[in-house]
Amino acid sequence: MSNAIPFIKRLILFLLPLTIILLYTEVQLRKMPNSYSKKKLNLEKQIGNAEVLVLGSSQALHGIDPTYFSLKGINAANISQSLYYDKEILKREIDKAKNLKYLIITVSYFTYFYEIHNSLESWRDLYYQKFWKLIPNAETTIWDAKNYSYIALYTPLKTAKYATSNFNVDLAPTLKTNGYIPLINKKSIKFISDQEGKKRVSLHNSIIKIENFKHTIAYLNEIIEIAKTKNIKVVIVTPPVYKTYYENCNEKLLTANDHLTQSISNYDNIKYFNYLKDKRFDKNDFYDNDHLNLQGAKKFSSIINTEILK
């Protein structure tokens, strides 16, 4: 036993610096701002005065800038955000939304058949859990290190990259306080083509699962019911995409989406605005095949203000 004591001491001396480095790294990663943590903070600060709340995925995140609303608005959409998290964010904030008049729910090509947990981006569930403090949409295994470690969540490779900047990193540097993130790289227009549009639609087709439908509709109905109890007007909006995207979509699915949303809007005085193929938008308004650029977002937000928030 006496021979083991020096070994244990050496082991402790070896592990102690490593443990300190790991703990320091975990703390720094936790403090590092990203779109989830920043949106949560901004929404908490502004929801009490907000008159318009926007929910949805990246087409809303990059396509709707509340700056151009005549009412005080905030955009709570995020990349690949599903109706489940739209619902959970609304539930979390609704009692503080004392002045909310309009709830804008954006619905895209894949929305009714999409859940994060059984998609290519299932890792995002843990971001909502870690940074929004929301219950994830699917049970996670206790053996998954991402449940406990920010190093595992961000991946060791990215963590090493952030460490070279001493974790002085903002992962959402262009996110405005109203929740909007502009897309301004003019060179991206070269990716707007029929070929790239097909690739994008193919990706979205791969995340469409019929079995998700019964769940997503239930989430949408719950969102509507929550808004009704607070006398908030619900508006469902389909954002515009460029023709290289919608011409490659499954036309039957587009029609089914439209009919379904129309039928929902017939109840409880819910309004539906379908801008998917709106001819007021041309190639110069788009960042890529299915996202508006800065100019397009200004145009779309102004249209929403004129045609919806009146």
Give the residues covered by each predicted segment.
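Hydrophobic membrane-insertion alpha-helices, especially the h-region
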Residues: 6-28
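Alpha-helical transmembrane signal-anchor/signal-peptide segments
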Residues: 29-49
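Secreted/periplasmic serine-hydrolase-like ester/acetyl group-modifying domain
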Residues: 116, 120-230
